[in-house]
């Protein structure tokens, strides 16, 4: 049988006649194969493959693509790229991004963190909160006086009295009289000054001093007065202050009185003596002299007579009495008696045993060296002018006839002549409260204990005796200035805090906001700060990747585009056919099992070709486009062909070696990946991968209620706050104020700033001084000292207290024989710390009541009998007030007369030593005089026990008319 090959040759069933038995097919072993399933398949090797639809396709790799015409052509876009551009396994150009960059809406964007945001122009900017502002493209502090910014940072403008001390802390310049104690400004308090309950300086006053009219004065008791601003002893009759300032008796020395052993003594002449055991001047009665009723009398003998209580001579012939003198008629001053001529003696004259005429001396008088002298006792002396004076010591002195106290050189101690009191002149800042000198602190000062300290509010504190400013995070002290610590990305520029704009960032001139300065090269576009690749036909972005768009019968296999297959229709098969692989019988049809890449086309077996492939007279071959050629059965790039130029837009650029990405400021490559280049003060968050600011101490992120982005804020604590305009300012409390943009102390009275040293000091007024350790203390004058409690008190000889009968006018003496008080006795006993008691006494009676006296009246007595506590006891005819002045409950024992100096009389009829007696001459109110004797430690009678006492006896009344008993004030003294 002769075969013929039809024009349309069927490779599967090439026979025209249908036969009942199946013959094995025939096929060319070159390109076809029968697989294990007895299916005829094409034998292909890579880069040929089958797509999902079973079409034979060509896998293209890097640098090759199939154009829309189905031709292969070179694609250098993926074969020559430079970091941060890269190509994936499919040959797609990608952008390697590192921390700080991400894609948003398929756009490259910077990932910003707290404190940074994008403005309306998509420029990176810093969000500033209160206290921060952006000026000249720099972040700076917005301050208000006394805060300011310098090239060194945030500083505090300080006024006088303030400076930066150790450890750069705010400190007060303290001068003399001030110190820092317990973190507070205080006045150094010296002796004599204390701090009262109102935290004011006050003088610490001891006994004998008081505060009056805001001055410290000496309390003058009875017997003392203030004259010419000096404490003076008020001297009465018989007392005076000598030129040496000593209180003494006022006597005329040499006239029967004199001082011996600091005691007033009577100089006795002939005819006078002191009987043994007695201190009384007694007469030696001679012939013609007798003592009757304690009076010296002359018994009238022959030739004598008593005439008008005077001894007179009964003159005879040849004698006459002339001017009370018996004389011869022929000679004056002589008289004859018993045939003898005798001298005629007048009052105060007498004769001794030898017949000499002598002076009759009374108590307190004596005859020495032929002269009658005053016998001066203790505390008295005879002055150079022969007058009886008192022995006194400074500060007592005589001013005219009065005893005064001298305050010369005593500083602030003054004398108020209106009320007779001492005072203390005080300067500004001091006042007197409750008899104490107080310091009046001004604003910003309070008392802490006894110390004057500044009243400080946070963040001011006391450190190392200086006022300091407590610094929070972000604030430090350097070169005596308060500075702001800056972290990475921040710097100081023109005295302001600014953000360092690194590569890829810049400040937009109109809004002064930080923005990106990115630029793009060819193949990329920059839209709204996002870099986008320019995609051509056949490319799209899916899942943030650039991929090739696949058409019909195309698929990806092993990273390459592959053509798909079309299932051929099954050939008509005769009934009851049997077949062997790759043939099979199905539904009475003989079918050919086709593998990928084979299809039945027009009832003929055909290859299913993908893009870039074709069948010509040479068989299956590749369709090559421009830039490619087949050489020796191998597909190669045409060396002489014109390369395809990629279409690139900024920031993609064409270089000699391929496609590159132009990087602008703020971008850099890190291990071939594009990332944001952060400068000082900025970093990439390691977790969230966004760009954020690095905040140092004192800065933080905040989120206002009306904003969605975080802003940068200055962290402040009181006294630093933000004003209404957001400026950083400084709150000042009591004691501080801001003047001329500087923080200054508010100085009250008693404080000032030295204009040279700028130290805070206490201006000193009169009576104050700066002592050791710069303490303010009272400058004491003569007569003043500090006691053990640092109070100002008078010197030992000036410490006084007074026991008295008060100033009432009611009668307080019941005379013997009466049942009710009849006279008012005023008695004051002023005791000095030396033990000397100065007494003043007077008595008053009137027509309505009281004791009346006349010439020759018998003696009257006032008994002041005292127990061992100085209280009046039974037997005293003094009653009523008997207390210590200004301290009624105080003990009176200190006023008792000394029993060693003045022995106690144990027998009522015995005699006391003369030193127990004080004789005084009183001037009666109705005219005349009387003698007053003060008896110390005498006894009233046997009916009353012996003990300490003061008994006043009035006698020798010399008056011409009957009158009530009242007389001048008498002054006396005794020792305790």
From Swiss-Prot:
Q: Name one GO cellular component term.
A: host cell nucleus
Q: What is its main location?
A: virion
Which of UniProt's keywords are assigned here?
Capsid protein, Host nucleus, Host-virus interaction, Late protein, Viral attachment to host adhesion receptor, Viral attachment to host cell, Virion, Virus entry into host cell
Q: Which is one Pfam family of this protein?
A: Adeno_shaft
State where the protein is found.
Virion; Host nucleus
Matching InterPro entries, A to Z? Answer: Adeno_fibre (IPR000931), Adeno_fibre_knob (IPR000978), Adenobir_fibre_prot_rpt/shaft (IPR000939), Adenovirus_pIV-like_att (IPR008982), Attachment_protein_shaft_sf (IPR009013), PbH1 (IPR006626)
Q: How does it assemble?
A: Homotrimer. Interacts (via N-terminal tail region) with pentons.
Q: What is this protein called?
A: Fiber protein
């Amino acid at each position: 049988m002769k075969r013929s090959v039809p024009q349309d040759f069927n490779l599967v069933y090439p026979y025209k006649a249908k036969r009942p038995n199946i013959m094995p097919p025939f096929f060319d072993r070159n390109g076809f194969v029968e697989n294990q399933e007895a299916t005829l398949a094409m034998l292909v090797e890579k880069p040929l493959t089958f797509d999902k639809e079973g079409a034979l396709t060509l896998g293209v790799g890097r640098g090759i693509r199939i154009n829309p015409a189905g031709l292969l052509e070179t694609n250098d876009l993926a074969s020559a790229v430079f970091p941060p551009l890269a190509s994936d396994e499919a040959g797609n150009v990608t952008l390697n991004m590192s921390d700080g960059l991400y894609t948003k809406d398929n756009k490259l964007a910077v990932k910003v963190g707290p404190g940074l945001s994008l403005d309306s122009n998509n420029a990176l900017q810093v969000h500033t909160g209160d206290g921060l502002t952006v000026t000249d493209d720099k972040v700076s502090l917005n301050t208000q006086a006394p805060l300011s910014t310098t090239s060194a940072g945030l500083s505090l403008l300080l006024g006088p009295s303030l400076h930066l001390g150790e450890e750069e802390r705010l400190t007060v310049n303290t001068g003399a009289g001030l110190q820092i104690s317990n973190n507070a400004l205080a006045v150094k308090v010296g002796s004599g000054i204390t701090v009262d309950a109102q935290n004011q300086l006050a003088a610490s006053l001891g006994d004998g001093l008081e505060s009056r009219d805001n001055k410290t004065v000496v309390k003058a008791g009875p017997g003392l007065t203030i004259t010419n601003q000096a404490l003076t002893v008020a001297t009465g009759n018989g007392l005076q202050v000598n030129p040496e300032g000593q209180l003494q008796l006022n006597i005329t020395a040499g006239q029967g009185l004199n001082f011996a052993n600091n005691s007033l003594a009577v100089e006795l002449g002939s005819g006078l003596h002191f009987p043994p055991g007695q201190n009384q001047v007694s007469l030696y009665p001679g012939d013609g002299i007798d003592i009757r009723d304690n009076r010296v009398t002359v018994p009238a003998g022959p030739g004598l007579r008593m005439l008008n209580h005077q001894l007179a001579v009964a003159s005879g012939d040849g004698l006459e009495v002339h001017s009370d003198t018996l004389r011869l008629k022929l000679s004056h001053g002589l008289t004859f008696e018993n045939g003898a001529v005798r001298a005629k003696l007048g009052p105060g004259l007498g004769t001794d045993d030898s017949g000499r005429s002598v002076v009759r001396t009374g108590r307190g008088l004596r005859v020495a060296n032929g002269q009658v002298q005053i016998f001066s006792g203790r505390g008295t002396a005879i002055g150079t002018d022969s007058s009886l004076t008192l022995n006194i010591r400074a500060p007592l002195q005589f001013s005219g006839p009065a005893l005064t106290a001298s305050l010369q050189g005593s500083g602030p101690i003054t004398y108020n002549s209106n009320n007779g009191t001492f005072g203390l002149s005080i300067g500004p800042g001091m006042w007197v409260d409750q008899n104490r000198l107080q310091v009046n602190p001004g604003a910003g000062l309070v008392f802490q204990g006894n110390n004057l300290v500044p009243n400080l509010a946070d963040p001011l504190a006391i450190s190392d005796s200086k006022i300091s400013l407590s610094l929070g995070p972000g604030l430090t002290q350097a070169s005596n200035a308060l500075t702001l610590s800056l972290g990475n990305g921040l710097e100081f520029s023109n005295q302001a805090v600014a953000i360092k704009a690194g590569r890829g960032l810049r400040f937009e001139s109109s809004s002064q906001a930080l923005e990106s300065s990115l630029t793009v090269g060819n193949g990329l576009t920059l839209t709204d700060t996002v870099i986008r690749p320019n995609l051509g036909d056949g490319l799209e972005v899916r899942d943030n990747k650039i991929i090739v768009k696949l058409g019909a019968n195309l698929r990806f296999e092993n990273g390459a585009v592959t053509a798909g297959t079309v299932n051929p229709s099954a050939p008509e098969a005769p009934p009851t056919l049997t077949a062997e692989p790759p043939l099979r019988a199905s539904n009475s049809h003989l079918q050919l099992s086709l593998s990928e890449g084979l299809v039945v086309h027009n009832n003929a077996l055909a290859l299913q070709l993908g893009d870039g492939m074709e069948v010509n007279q040479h068989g299956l071959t590749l369709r090559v486009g421009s830039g490619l050629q087949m050489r020796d059965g191998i597909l190669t790039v045409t060396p002489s062909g014109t390369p395809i130029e990629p279409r690139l837009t900024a920031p993609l650029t064409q270089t000699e070696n391929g496609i590159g990405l132009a990087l602008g400021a703020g971008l850099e490559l890190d291990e071939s990946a594009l990332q944001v280049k952060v400068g000082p003060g900025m970093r990439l968050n390691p977790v969230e991968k966004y760009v954020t600011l690095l905040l140092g101490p004192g800065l933080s992120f905040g989120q206002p209620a009306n904003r969605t982005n975080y802003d940068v804020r200055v962290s402040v604590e009181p006294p630093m706050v933000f004003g209404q305009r957001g400026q950083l300012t400084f709150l000042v409390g009591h004691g501080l104020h801001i003047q001329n943009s500087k923080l200054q102390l508010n100085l009250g009275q008693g404080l000032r700033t030295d204009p040279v040293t700028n130290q805070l000091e206490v201006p000193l007024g009169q009576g104050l001084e700066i002592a050791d350790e710069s303490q303010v203390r009272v400058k004491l004058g003569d007569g003043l000292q500090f006691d053990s409690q640092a109070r100002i008190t008078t010197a030992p000889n000036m410490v006084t207290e007074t026991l008295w009968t008060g100033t009432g006018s009611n009668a307080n003496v019941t005379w013997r024989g009466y049942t009710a008080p009849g006279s008012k006795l005023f008695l004051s006993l002023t005791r000095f710390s030396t033990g000397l008691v100065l007494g003043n006494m007077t008595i008053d009676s009137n027509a309505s009541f009281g004791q009346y006296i006349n010439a020759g009246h018998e003696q009257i007595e006032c008994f002041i009998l005292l127990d061992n506590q100085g209280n009046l006891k039974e037997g005293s005819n003094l009653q009523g007030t008997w207390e210590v002045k200004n301290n009624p409950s105080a003990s009176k024992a200190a006023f008792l007369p000394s029993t060693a100096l003045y022995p106690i009389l144990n027998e009522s009829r015995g005699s006391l030593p003369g030193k127990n007696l004080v004789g005084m001459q009183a001037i009666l109110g109705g005219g005349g005089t009387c003698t007053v004797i003060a008896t110390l430690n005498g006894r009233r009678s046997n009916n009353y026990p012996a003990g300490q006492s003061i008994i006043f006896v009035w006698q020798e009344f010399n008056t011409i008319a009957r009158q009530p008993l009242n007389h001048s004030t008498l002054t006396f003294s005794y020792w305790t």
